[in-house]
Amino acid sequence: MGDCGCSGASSCNCGSGCSCSNCGSK
């Protein structure tokens, strides 16, 4: 469970050790 699934500008699923552009670095 350390995946990042971004589908959309407001639909970001940030897990452990994931850094999305629209999500904060977690």
Swiss-Prot record:
Chain sites annotated for binding Cu(+) 2: 6, 23
Molecular function in Gene Ontology: metal ion binding
Spans annotated as Disordered: 1-26
Composition-biased stretches (Cys residues): 15-26
Similarity-based family: Belongs to the metallothionein superfamily. Type 8 family.
Protein name: Metallothionein
Record InterPro entries: Metalthion_dom_sf
Record keywords, A-Z: Copper, Metal-binding, Metal-thiolate cluster
Annotated Cu(+) 1 binding sites: 4, 23
Conditions for induction: By copper.
Residues annotated for Cu(+) 5 binding in this entry: 12, 18
Binding locations of Cu(+) 6: 14, 18
